[in-house]
A protein has these predicted regions:
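His/Asp/Glu-enriched, well-ordered alpha-helical/loop segment
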Residues: 75-86, 93-114, 118-119, 124-128, ...
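A structural microfeature
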Residues: 266-267, 276
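Short, isolated positions in well-ordered beta-strands
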Residues: 12, 275-276
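Short proline/glycine-enriched turn/loop segments at secondary-structure junctions
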Residues: 255-260
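Metal-coordinating catalytic core of metallo-dependent amide/deamination hydrolases
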Residues: 1-92, 100, 129-136, 141, ...
Length: 279
């Protein structure tokens, strides 16, 4: 089975910032707090919390549970119980703590299957470390549509990037997509469209250079997702694999990205047996 561990909170994610980054956040937060959407901006600020300077000289926000020094022990227990581990880590501080926990036990990365859930605000250095450790990242492109407008009111300070899917994929990270329902819409076609278009709910672009192709987004939902879950006989249609498939009313590769969420499933097949039919 798979155990879930939270390295940070959801709304109170663990960001680790320099003094310069904190000043940038304060400026954008103040500006947004007096702007036309000040109510939303102030609510976001309350949920993010106030950064605290810690002995490492960096400023940290968010909830960390368990304490970072407990993570290596938790990972070791998972390895000894033959469990995989899904670590909830939204902010760069949380992702870095997962990498440090793996580094603290030299053989741990080979003994336990670990995947990072979310990794929403990270920089190029962390992306390189995730890739070097071949750590899968399970991301939620639907968050771009559901929460992108709110998050861009007070954007993460550079060099942090918001859901940098293109950079992750190009670096060699096994990138898997999920919905995180009910936090975002369950429909995977909404997620595919979000990964390809990177538009928020108001139609504004969010770092469009981080967009994926439709084919890449579909792979993240299928083949890479199966690999991340350790399923050797799923995720692709080929001899020897399970005949798990859906029949849809449109070809996603020939459908406009904006129309992808409207694709309808006509029938579902599991192990070669039809288990659902709308026709």
């Amino acid at each position: 089975g798979t155990a879930k561990v939270l390295a940070d909170g959801g709304e109170y994610c663990h960001l680790c910032m320099t003094s310069k980054q904190v000043r940038t956040v304060m400026k954008t937060s103040t500006r947004a707090g007096f702007g036309p959407e000040r109510g939303l901006a102030r609510a976001m600020g309350r949920r993010a919390g106030f950064p605290r300077r810690e002995p490492d000289g960096m400023w940290h926000t968010g909830i960390r549970f368990p304490e970072e020094n407990a993570l290596p022990q938790i990972l070791r227990i998972a390895a000894e119980s033959d469990s995989a581990l899904a670590v909830h880590a939204i902010g760069n501080g949380a992702v870095a703590s997962v990498l440090r926990a793996l580094a603290a036990d030299s053989g741990l990365a080979e003994d336990v299957s670990v995947r990072v859930e979310h990794a929403m605000a990270i920089d190029i250095a962390l992306i390189g470390s995730l890739a070097a450790n071949r750590l899968p990242v399970v991301a939620q492109p639907g968050f771009l549509t559901a929460f992108g407008h709110e998050l861009n009111l007070t954007p993460v300070p550079k060099p942090l990037q918001l859901m940098p899917f293109r950079t992750m994929l190009d670096a060699g990270i096994p990138l898997t997509f999920s919905s995180d329902f009910p936090a975002a819409e369950l429909n995977p076609w909404t997620g595919v469209a979000a990964a390809a278009a990177r538009l928020d709910s108001h139609g504004s672009a969010i770092d469009p250079e981080q967009a994926l192709t439709v084919a890449e987004a579909l792979t993240a939902y299928t083949a890479t997702a199966a690999d991340t879950l350790g399923l050797d006989d799923a995720g692709t249609l080929e001899p020897g694999n399970r005949a798990d498939l859906i029949w849809c009313d449109a070809d996603p590769h020939a459908t406009a990205v904006a129309d992808l969420p409207g694709i309808t499933v006509l029938s579902t097949w599991i192990d070669g047996r039809r288990v659902f039919s709308a026709v």
